[in-house]
């Protein structure tokens, strides 16, 4: 049975007019041929509304009951979409994550998908109906609702596509595809017809917002084609997929995009006992709280001091602040949080093989008078820390320095089967 999975985010479902517009997309695909399974997010603003209600009654940040409450948003969207499709003459059934067989780990608020049964989804598709599945949620081993955290609905869609062996997973949003920079801050940014999954994962991690890193990583592991398209246009979007290409890497443009992230905090930790390494204790604290670390710098040990620094999400600083202060104090040291920084990254392939790229990055920012600190390099990403208020200036400078507003790289046309992702 040929299957297509489509995912619609909160912005695409924010009003009834947008719900109907998304339903027309689904109807078009359903009438054209393959069976269609749809994954939906909560309607725009609904999750924030539910979080405010929980905060008003003093609910803990991550708990069983909060997950029960937040799951209402996606359930509302799924039922509303199924009702809309039914009114258009398209038979549809809404399924919660539990009903769709989505199994998760036990971490409330940030669970991982551990498996999908999908028997009821298959039964609906076999009966000619559209299966509308709630994203962002499943059930843990105890049978309790668990939400998936950042990127949860995208991850649900990719996991379902993998389980159903779908031809592709289409993710619909409000932009035309993956861009060479965020088009909201740089109108000259170019829509990319095709992006390698590894590069897309780096772009997502480094600040590209439309697709989450975990969704792309899962798609790459499971061989799922992903296409992100604009729900309001017929633009072809961006294909995120591996592709065979006979030309050597040296003939292609190595730099694909410039990304930025202002949800960044730089954390500086020091201790006065140079005989002890506090790094293992610091990273234990971060890991126990699910806090992702990016750039890391260490200096010392010196005669009387050991220092280290790293970046985390600014929005997660409160989660780890007290525990880090406690660890540092146990070493006779302290912690400083710098919240006034941004991260700008040049993303592509084979970047370490071209040492001139790091030189070009630093020279361009220096010429623009943008202070820099902490540079990190890999084959797919060059990242640098800049003052928060100069982040957009740095994006514009590097986009120009690497000539990313020019024509698409050779051979960047979408694969025949097509898939798209967007920044």
What is each of the regions a protein language model found here?
Residues 23, 27-30, 162, 220, ...:
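A structural alpha-helix within SAM-dependent methyltransferase catalytic domains
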């Amino acid at each position: 049975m040929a299957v297509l999975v489509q995912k619609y985010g909160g912005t695409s479902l924010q009003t009834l007019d947008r719900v109907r517009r998304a339903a027309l997309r689904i109807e078009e695909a359903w009438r054209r041929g393959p069976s269609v399974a749809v994954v939906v997010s909560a309607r725009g603003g609904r999750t924030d509304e539910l979080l405010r209600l929980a905060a008003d009654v003093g609910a803990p940040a991550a708990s069983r009951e909060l997950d029960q409450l937040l799951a209402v948003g996606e359930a509302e969207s799924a039922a509303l979409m199924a009702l809309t499709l039914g009114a258009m003459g398209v038979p549809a059934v809404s399924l919660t994550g539990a009903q769709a067989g989505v199994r998760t780990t036990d971490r409330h608020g940030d669970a991982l998908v551990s498996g999908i049964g999908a028997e009821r989804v298959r039964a609906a598709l076999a009966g000619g109906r559209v299966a509308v599945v709630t994203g962002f949620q499943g059930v843990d081993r105890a049978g309790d609702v668990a939400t998936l955290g950042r990127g949860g609905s995208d991850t649900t869609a990719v996991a379902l596509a993998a389980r159903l062996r779908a031809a592709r997973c289409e993710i619909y949003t409000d932009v035309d595809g993956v861009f060479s920079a965020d088009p909201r801050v740089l109108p000259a940014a170019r829509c990319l017809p095709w992006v390698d999954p590894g590069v897309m994962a780096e772009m997502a991690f480094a600040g590209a917002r439309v697709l989450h890193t975990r969704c792309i990583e899962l798609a790459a592991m499971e061989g799922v084609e992903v296409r992100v398209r604009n729900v309001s246009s017929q633009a072809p979007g961006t294909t995120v997929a591996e592709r065979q290409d006979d030309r050597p890497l040296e003939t292609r443009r190595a730099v694909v995009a410039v990304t930025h992230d202002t949800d960044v905090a730089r954390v500086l930790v020091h201790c006065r006992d140079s005989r002890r390494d506090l790094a293992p204790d610091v990273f234990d604290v971060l890991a126990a709280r699910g806090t992702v670390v990016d750039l890391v710098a260490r200096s010392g040990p010196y005669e009387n001091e050991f220092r280290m620094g790293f970046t985390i999400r600014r929005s997660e600083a409160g989660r780890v602040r007290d525990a880090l202060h406690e660890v540092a104090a146990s070493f006779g040291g302290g912690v400083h949080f710098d919240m006034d920084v941004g991260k700008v990254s040049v993303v592509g392939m084979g970047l370490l093989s071209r040492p001139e790229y790091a030189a070009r990055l630093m020279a361009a920012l220096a010429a623009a008078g943008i202070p820099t600190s902490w540079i990190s390099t890999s084959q797919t990403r060059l990242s640098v820390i800049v003052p928060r208020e100069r982040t957009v200036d740095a994006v514009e400078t590097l986009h120009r320095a690497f000539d990313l507003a020019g024509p698409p790289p050779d051979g960047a046309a979408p694969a025949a089967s097509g898939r798209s992702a967007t920044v």
